[in-house]
Amino acid sequence: MRKIIIAIVALTVLLGACSDKSAFDLEVGDCFDDPSSFEEVESVPIKECADPHDNEVYANSTMSGTSWPGVAAVEEFADEACYTEFERYVGIAYEDSLLEFGWLVPTEASWAEVDDRTVTCIVYNLDLSKMTGSMQGVAF
């Protein structure tokens, strides 16, 4: 039960025929299409990065603390963590890129029920078109 928050623009919801992976198990380099809903994401349709896809995981950052910090604090952590990791993965500063970033973050329920502290950073095309190939080191 992860909630996706998208910086600047909302992603278009597209479905694809592929295998699903738990949102809790996403790893750097995983490529996937948009889930059917971004409210609370439990799984995403995984794609081969060589095939057209909507998103790619470029970082996972772990929040600390035992008490739920609130939505604003989670979003602030996600924005800072994903911004910081963007250039390391893509190879160009976010401000100079044609790519956008967003994130999957813990919900209050997942924080309490399954000890979810992971913020998953994702990259996607600013124009919401499909990407082909990994975005690692593309520098655009």
Task: Give residue ranges: language-model regions.
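Sec-dependent bacterial lipoprotein signal peptides
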Residues: 1-16
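Primary mode marks residue(s) on the alpha4-beta5-alpha5 output face of response regulator receiver
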Residues: 18-140
